[in-house]
Protein backbone atom coordinates (compact mmCIF):
# COMPACT_ATOMS: atom_id res chain seq x y z
CA UNK A 1 0.00 0.00 0.00
CA UNK A 2 1.22 3.51 -0.83
CA UNK A 3 0.37 6.75 0.95
CA UNK A 4 1.39 10.36 0.24
CA UNK A 5 2.30 12.72 3.08
CA UNK A 6 2.33 16.48 2.48
CA UNK A 7 2.67 19.20 5.08
CA UNK A 8 2.92 22.94 5.59
CA UNK A 9 1.48 24.10 2.31
CA UNK A 10 0.88 27.62 3.77
CA UNK A 11 -1.63 28.82 1.19
CA UNK A 12 -1.80 32.58 0.61
CA UNK A 13 -3.62 34.96 -1.71
CA UNK A 14 -2.93 34.26 -5.39
CA UNK A 15 0.50 35.57 -6.34
CA UNK A 16 1.60 36.27 -2.76
CA UNK A 17 4.93 34.78 -1.71
CA UNK A 18 6.69 33.50 1.41
CA UNK A 19 10.47 33.62 1.29
CA UNK A 20 10.24 34.52 -2.38
CA UNK A 21 8.20 31.39 -3.14
CA UNK A 22 4.56 31.15 -4.23
CA UNK A 23 2.74 28.68 -1.94
CA UNK A 24 -0.24 28.12 -4.25
CA UNK A 25 1.96 27.53 -7.28
CA UNK A 26 4.20 25.15 -5.35
CA UNK A 27 1.23 23.25 -3.95
CA UNK A 28 -0.04 22.84 -7.50
CA UNK A 29 3.42 21.57 -8.50
CA UNK A 30 3.35 19.06 -5.65
CA UNK A 31 -0.12 17.81 -6.60
CA UNK A 32 0.88 17.40 -10.25
CA UNK A 33 4.18 15.69 -9.43
CA UNK A 34 2.53 13.30 -6.97
CA UNK A 35 -0.24 12.41 -9.40
CA UNK A 36 2.23 11.82 -12.22
CA UNK A 37 4.46 9.45 -10.26
CA UNK A 38 2.09 8.08 -7.60
CA UNK A 39 -1.40 7.95 -9.08
CA UNK A 40 -1.76 4.54 -7.43
CA UNK A 41 -1.52 5.96 -3.90
CA UNK A 42 -4.45 4.97 -1.71
CA UNK A 43 -4.52 8.21 0.26
CA UNK A 44 -2.91 11.65 0.56
CA UNK A 45 -2.67 13.30 3.98
CA UNK A 46 -1.73 16.96 4.52
CA UNK A 47 -0.62 17.53 8.12
CA UNK A 48 -1.46 21.14 8.76
CA UNK A 49 -0.56 24.75 8.15
CA UNK A 50 -2.94 24.61 5.25
CA UNK A 51 -3.25 28.40 5.20
CA UNK A 52 -0.55 30.87 6.21
CA UNK A 53 -2.99 33.09 8.15
CA UNK A 54 -6.11 30.95 8.40
CA UNK A 55 -7.96 32.95 5.76
CA UNK A 56 -11.37 31.68 4.74
CA UNK A 57 -10.59 32.19 1.05
CA UNK A 58 -7.61 29.83 1.33
CA UNK A 59 -9.82 27.05 2.69
CA UNK A 60 -12.46 27.69 0.05
CA UNK A 61 -9.85 27.43 -2.70
CA UNK A 62 -8.38 24.29 -1.11
CA UNK A 63 -11.79 22.62 -0.91
CA UNK A 64 -12.47 23.29 -4.57
CA UNK A 65 -9.00 22.12 -5.60
CA UNK A 66 -9.17 18.88 -3.61
CA UNK A 67 -12.70 18.13 -4.80
CA UNK A 68 -11.23 18.08 -8.32
CA UNK A 69 -8.21 15.94 -7.39
CA UNK A 70 -8.52 12.25 -8.30
CA UNK A 71 -6.90 10.92 -5.10
CA UNK A 72 -8.64 10.92 -1.71
CA UNK A 73 -7.15 13.56 0.62
CA UNK A 74 -7.47 13.99 4.40
CA UNK A 75 -6.43 17.05 6.35
CA UNK A 76 -5.04 18.08 9.73
CA UNK A 77 -4.75 21.67 10.94
CA UNK A 78 -1.68 23.43 12.35
CA UNK A 79 -0.69 26.57 14.20
CA UNK A 80 -1.16 28.83 11.16
CA UNK A 81 -4.73 27.59 10.68
CA UNK A 82 -7.93 28.93 12.23
CA UNK A 83 -10.19 26.10 13.31
CA UNK A 84 -13.50 27.97 12.95
CA UNK A 85 -12.71 29.20 9.46
CA UNK A 86 -11.50 25.76 8.43
CA UNK A 87 -14.58 23.98 9.77
CA UNK A 88 -16.89 26.45 8.04
CA UNK A 89 -15.58 24.97 4.79
CA UNK A 90 -14.86 21.40 5.97
CA UNK A 91 -17.63 20.84 8.58
CA UNK A 92 -17.55 17.08 8.13
CA UNK A 93 -14.04 16.90 9.66
CA UNK A 94 -15.07 17.95 13.20
CA UNK A 95 -15.19 15.48 16.07
CA UNK A 96 -17.84 15.57 18.81
CA UNK A 97 -15.90 18.27 20.70
CA UNK A 98 -15.42 20.54 17.70
CA UNK A 99 -11.80 19.61 17.04
CA UNK A 100 -10.49 18.61 13.62
CA UNK A 101 -10.05 14.90 14.30
CA UNK A 102 -11.18 11.81 12.46
CA UNK A 103 -10.67 8.30 11.13
CA UNK A 104 -9.94 6.81 7.72
CA UNK A 105 -9.37 3.09 7.13
CA UNK A 106 -6.72 1.96 4.64
CA UNK A 107 -5.10 -1.31 3.63
CA UNK A 108 -2.17 -0.45 5.93
CA UNK A 109 -4.26 0.32 8.98
CA UNK A 110 -6.65 2.79 10.55
CA UNK A 111 -5.52 6.41 10.14
CA UNK A 112 -6.21 8.79 13.02
CA UNK A 113 -6.00 12.52 12.27
CA UNK A 114 -5.19 14.63 15.33
CA UNK A 115 -5.79 18.32 16.06
CA UNK A 116 -2.83 19.87 17.91
CA UNK A 117 -3.65 23.52 17.16
CA UNK A 118 -4.18 26.15 19.87
CA UNK A 119 -5.40 29.69 19.12
CA UNK A 120 -2.84 32.47 18.67
CA UNK A 121 0.25 30.48 19.52
CA UNK A 122 2.65 28.54 17.35
CA UNK A 123 3.11 25.87 20.02
CA UNK A 124 0.85 22.82 20.01
CA UNK A 125 -1.56 21.63 22.67
CA UNK A 126 -3.44 18.37 23.17
CA UNK A 127 -6.03 18.93 25.88
CA UNK A 128 -8.00 16.45 27.98
CA UNK A 129 -10.88 16.33 25.49
CA UNK A 130 -8.51 15.50 22.65
CA UNK A 131 -6.60 12.97 24.73
CA UNK A 132 -9.93 11.34 25.62
CA UNK A 133 -10.90 11.13 21.96
CA UNK A 134 -7.59 9.51 21.06
CA UNK A 135 -7.75 7.07 23.98
CA UNK A 136 -11.23 5.98 22.92
CA UNK A 137 -10.23 5.50 19.28
CA UNK A 138 -7.16 3.44 20.20
CA UNK A 139 -9.13 1.33 22.67
CA UNK A 140 -12.10 0.55 20.41
CA UNK A 141 -10.14 -1.06 17.57
CA UNK A 142 -7.43 -3.71 17.27
CA UNK A 143 -5.38 -1.62 14.85
CA UNK A 144 -2.87 -1.26 13.42
CA UNK A 145 -3.01 2.54 13.54
CA UNK A 146 -1.26 5.33 11.68
CA UNK A 147 -1.24 8.68 13.50
CA UNK A 148 -1.11 12.04 11.68
CA UNK A 149 -0.58 15.36 13.45
CA UNK A 150 0.99 18.77 12.89
CA UNK A 151 3.26 19.52 15.86
CA UNK A 152 6.36 17.51 16.69
CA UNK A 153 5.50 15.24 19.66
CA UNK A 154 9.13 14.93 20.77
CA UNK A 155 12.05 17.37 21.04
CA UNK A 156 14.08 17.94 17.89
CA UNK A 157 16.93 19.58 19.86
CA UNK A 158 16.79 22.81 17.89
CA UNK A 159 15.86 25.38 20.54
CA UNK A 160 13.60 27.67 18.46
CA UNK A 161 11.62 24.69 17.15
CA UNK A 162 11.31 23.05 20.56
CA UNK A 163 9.75 26.22 21.97
CA UNK A 164 6.81 25.62 19.63
CA UNK A 165 6.61 21.83 19.83
CA UNK A 166 3.62 19.94 21.23
CA UNK A 167 3.69 21.29 24.80
CA UNK A 168 1.50 18.44 26.08
CA UNK A 169 4.04 15.95 24.81
CA UNK A 170 4.35 14.02 28.09
CA UNK A 171 0.68 12.97 28.46
CA UNK A 172 0.51 12.39 24.71
CA UNK A 173 3.51 10.05 24.77
CA UNK A 174 2.18 8.27 27.83
CA UNK A 175 -1.11 7.65 26.07
CA UNK A 176 0.32 6.37 22.80
CA UNK A 177 2.94 4.41 24.72
CA UNK A 178 0.19 2.36 26.34
CA UNK A 179 -0.99 1.40 22.84
CA UNK A 180 2.39 1.23 21.10
CA UNK A 181 1.90 -2.39 20.01
CA UNK A 182 -1.00 -1.25 17.80
CA UNK A 183 0.54 1.93 16.30
CA UNK A 184 2.74 1.48 13.23
CA UNK A 185 3.91 5.05 12.67
CA UNK A 186 3.44 8.69 13.65
CA UNK A 187 3.59 11.31 10.87
CA UNK A 188 3.97 15.02 11.65
CA UNK A 189 4.97 18.33 10.07
CA UNK A 190 5.55 21.81 11.54
CA UNK A 191 9.37 21.92 11.49
CA UNK A 192 9.84 22.01 7.69
CA UNK A 193 12.69 19.52 8.19
CA UNK A 194 13.29 15.86 7.33
CA UNK A 195 13.17 14.15 10.72
CA UNK A 196 13.04 10.56 11.93
CA UNK A 197 12.87 9.14 15.42
CA UNK A 198 10.41 7.54 17.79
CA UNK A 199 7.58 8.57 20.08
CA UNK A 200 7.21 6.31 23.12
CA UNK A 201 8.89 3.58 21.08
CA UNK A 202 6.75 4.20 17.97
CA UNK A 203 8.55 5.14 14.73
CA UNK A 204 7.93 8.75 13.68
CA UNK A 205 8.89 10.90 10.71
CA UNK A 206 8.50 14.37 9.26
CA UNK A 207 9.57 16.24 6.13
CA UNK A 208 9.96 19.60 4.44
CA UNK A 209 6.90 21.52 3.35
CA UNK A 210 5.73 22.15 -0.18
CA UNK A 211 6.88 25.79 -0.17
CA UNK A 212 9.58 27.09 2.20
CA UNK A 213 12.20 25.04 4.02
CA UNK A 214 14.04 25.17 7.33
CA UNK A 215 17.61 24.10 8.11
CA UNK A 216 19.02 22.32 11.20
CA UNK A 217 21.05 25.32 12.40
CA UNK A 218 22.04 24.13 15.87
CA UNK A 219 24.00 27.32 16.61
CA UNK A 220 20.84 29.47 16.45
CA UNK A 221 18.99 29.52 19.77
CA UNK A 222 16.37 32.25 19.27
CA UNK A 223 14.99 32.42 15.74
CA UNK A 224 13.69 29.79 13.32
CA UNK A 225 16.01 29.00 10.42
CA UNK A 226 15.06 29.31 6.75
CA UNK A 227 16.75 28.02 3.61
CA UNK A 228 16.33 27.66 -0.14
CA UNK A 229 16.41 23.86 -0.04
CA UNK A 230 13.98 22.15 -2.44
CA UNK A 231 10.31 21.77 -1.65
CA UNK A 232 9.22 18.22 -0.86
CA UNK A 233 6.48 15.73 -0.15
CA UNK A 234 6.57 12.21 1.29
CA UNK A 235 5.87 8.82 -0.26
CA UNK A 236 5.25 5.99 2.19
CA UNK A 237 5.16 2.27 1.38
CA UNK A 238 3.62 -0.26 3.75
CA UNK A 239 4.26 -3.99 3.74
CA UNK A 240 3.01 -6.58 6.18
CA UNK A 241 6.02 -6.07 8.44
CA UNK A 242 7.72 -2.85 7.31
CA UNK A 243 7.21 0.85 6.57
CA UNK A 244 9.43 2.75 4.09
CA UNK A 245 9.36 6.56 4.00
CA UNK A 246 10.79 8.67 1.16
CA UNK A 247 11.07 12.46 0.95
CA UNK A 248 10.68 13.49 -2.69
CA UNK A 249 12.24 16.87 -3.47
CA UNK A 250 9.91 17.87 -6.29
CA UNK A 251 11.33 21.39 -6.17
CA UNK A 252 14.82 20.25 -7.20
CA UNK A 253 15.62 21.63 -10.66
CA UNK A 254 19.12 20.23 -11.21
CA UNK A 255 20.25 17.24 -13.27
CA UNK A 256 19.47 13.67 -12.26
CA UNK A 257 21.76 10.99 -13.69
CA UNK A 258 21.40 7.26 -14.11
CA UNK A 259 24.56 5.26 -13.70
CA UNK A 260 25.99 1.82 -13.13
CA UNK A 261 25.06 -1.30 -15.05
CA UNK A 262 21.77 -3.17 -15.45
CA UNK A 263 23.82 -6.26 -14.68
CA UNK A 264 24.32 -5.81 -10.97
CA UNK A 265 26.49 -8.90 -10.76
CA UNK A 266 29.12 -7.14 -12.84
CA UNK A 267 32.03 -5.99 -10.70
CA UNK A 268 34.60 -4.19 -12.83
CA UNK A 269 35.75 -0.63 -13.42
CA UNK A 270 34.38 -0.39 -16.97
CA UNK A 271 30.75 -1.23 -16.23
CA UNK A 272 30.72 0.70 -12.93
CA UNK A 273 32.22 3.91 -14.36
CA UNK A 274 30.51 7.05 -13.04
Predicted feature descriptions by range:
Residues 56-136, 171-182, 223, 227-237, ...:
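Extended active-site neighborhood of metal-dependent phosphoesterases/phosphodiesterases
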Residues 12-15, 52-56, 79-87, 119-122, ...:
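Active-site environment of divalent metal-dependent phosphoester hydrolases
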Amino acid sequence: MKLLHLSDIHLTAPGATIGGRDPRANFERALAHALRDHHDAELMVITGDLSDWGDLTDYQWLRQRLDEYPLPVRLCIGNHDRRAAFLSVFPDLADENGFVQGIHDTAAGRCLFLDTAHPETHAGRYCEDRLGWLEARLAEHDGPFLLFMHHNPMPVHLAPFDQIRLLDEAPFRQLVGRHRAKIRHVFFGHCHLPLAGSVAGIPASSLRGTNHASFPLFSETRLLSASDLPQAYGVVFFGDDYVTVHMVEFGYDGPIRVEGSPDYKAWDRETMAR
